[in-house]
Amino acid sequence: MGCCGCSGGCGSGCGGCGSGCGGCGSGCGGYGSGCGGCGSSCCVPVCCCKPVCCCVPACSCSSCGSCGGSKGDCGSCGGSKGGCGSCGGSKGGCGSCGGSKGGCGSCGGSKGGCGSCGGSKGGCGSCGGSKGGCGSCGCSQCNCCKPCCCSSGCGSCCQSSCCNPCCCQSSCCVPVCCQSSCCKPCCCQSSCCVPVCCQCKI
């Protein structure tokens, strides 16, 4: 398994991560600068490229250890998710998403094409499960809203292709959002990200 965390390795199937992975190895012991230094506290010890390294908890727990390394089903998630089930039943279809997919099922079942998103769909559920068409939002580009629709709880988000046609919410767009040249340092409001860019509204 390559740093993309999908069965096809780091090829085009992963959104062409390659160097975008920041040089994190398949074991992701040292994620590299692209990961923000989450290190061992990350629930997904494989790098999921979107196209940068993202150390995203597959479930809602802060670390694999706290999820219960004794859970016994780490292997089924490629060693990335100690206790998905204990984190809200988001164990869904880890294997089918190349091991990096903690919560396919937690997206309400509409997340059927994890593979089409490069298999690096770290935390579908964290976007509220409303992410039906991840491909149309360029989900492989997002390291924030997983797969890429911006929602109130996504935190720092909105890579260059994240919010089209999605809209950012007030808490999503720090430090940048939507298109590469817009809304810095402003946050997008609900109407600003369609269809191309967002104007700063304060």
UniProtKB/Swiss-Prot annotation:
Per UniProt, subunit arrangement is: Interacts with hair keratins.
The UniProt keyword set, sorted, is: Keratin, Repeat
Lineage, top ranks: Eukaryota, Metazoa, Chordata, Craniata, Vertebrata
Q: Which family does it belong to?
A: Belongs to the KRTAP type 5 family.
Q: Encoded by which gene?
A: KRTAP5-10
Q: Give the region (7 X 4 AA repeats of C-C-X-P) as residue ranges.
A: 48-195
The identity of this protein, by name, is Keratin-associated protein 5-10
Q: What is the superkingdom listed in this entry's lineage?
A: Eukaryota
Cellular compartments per GO CC:
cytosol; intermediate filament
Expression by tissue, per the entry, reads: Expressed in hair root but not in skin. Expressed also in brain and skeletal muscle.
Membrane-spanning segments: none
Q: Which organism was this protein described from?
A: Homo sapiens (Human)
Q: What does this protein do?
A: In the hair cortex, hair keratin intermediate filaments are embedded in an interfilamentous matrix, consisting of hair keratin-associated protein (KRTAP), which are essential for the formation of a rigid and resistant hair shaft through their extensive disulfide bond cross-linking with abundant cysteine residues of hair keratins. The matrix proteins include the high-sulfur and high-glycine-tyrosine keratins.
Spell out the residue ranges that the record assigns to sequence repeats. 48-51, 54-57, 144-147, 162-165, 172-175, 182-185, 192-195
